[in-house]
């Protein structure tokens, strides 16, 4: 193994909920943290530009609201003797939540700057120039409204939601429109980039099942090409066998 689990890693791993870990000493490209935990930077060396900007403008500046919206539950700190320990962030937003206000901006620059002075638990910043259909800016969130992550896989996420009113939910996952499709109760649903990098979605009142599926077009196209090639190959084989049998019978006669 490239790394050995420390006592600190073992302490964090005792928490079996879904959260993220941030080690300021490692920063965006911390391989060790990603090896043992779900780190903010992820395990892949190539990082989305939006995530890089969040680190540069907010995480490195200790913006707690951004840490909360990224569901950072543990921050690796050092004590006076230089020993690392996991500091618990009790205010992490969790995997998804309902907000009662959309804060409109008109550019990506305004969007990332607005994260300096917003409340990530009750507000979501949206670029209304990019999404002019988001005209409703106020939502009612009752005290029992909930949205829970019930299935978590690299290419599939499922949530269970319950809200007395039509709502707007924010999901602590990077917005990546090229492949991720959203569904509510099995029906396709639009989702939006909010808070500069996350996913947002309008959710109707009541109890619902929300799914995100990674279905990139390149994979679908490749699968279709593979299927067509296999069918063509099968036809060639069948045709070849038919021709061989026909020629054999002709020679016998």
Regions found by a protein language model. Name each.
Residues 1-173, 180, 252:
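Conserved luminal/periplasmic juxtamembrane motif of membrane-embedded glycan-processing enzymes
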Residues 122, 126-253:
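Active-site-proximal, structured, solvent-exposed surfaces of multi-pass membrane proteins
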């Amino acid at each position: 193994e490239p790394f050995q689990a420390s006592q600190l890693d073992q302490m964090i791993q005792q928490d079996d909920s879904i959260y993220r870990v941030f080690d300021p000493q490692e920063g965006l490209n911390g391989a060790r943290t990603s090896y043992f935990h779900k780190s903010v930077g992820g395990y892949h060396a190539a990082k989305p530009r939006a995530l890089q900007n969040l680190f540069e403008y907010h995480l490195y500046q200790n913006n707690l609201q951004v840490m909360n919206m990224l569901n950072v539950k543990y921050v690796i700190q050092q004590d006076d003797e230089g020993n690392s320990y996991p500091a618990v962030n009790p205010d992490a937003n969790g995997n998804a939540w309902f907000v009662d206000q959309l804060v409109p901006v008109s550019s990506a620059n305004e969007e990332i700057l607005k994260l300096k002075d917003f409340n990530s638990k009750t507000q979501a910043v949206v670029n209304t120039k990019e999404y002019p259909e988001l005209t409703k800016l106020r939502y009612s969130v009752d005290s029992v409204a909930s949205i829970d992550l019930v299935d978590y896989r690299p290419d599939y996420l499922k949530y269970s939601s319950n809200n007395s009113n039509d709502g707007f939910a924010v999901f602590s996952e990077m917005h990546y429109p090229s492949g991720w499709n959203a569904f509510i109760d099995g029906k396709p649903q639009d989702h939006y980039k909010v808070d500069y990098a996350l996913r947002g979605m309008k959710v109707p009142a009541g109890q619902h099942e929300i799914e995100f599926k990674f279905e990139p077009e390149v994979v679908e196209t490749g699968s279709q090409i593979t299927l067509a090639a296999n069918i063509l190959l099968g036809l060639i084989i069948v045709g070849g066998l038919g021709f061989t049998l026909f020629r054999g019978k002709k020679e016998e006669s």
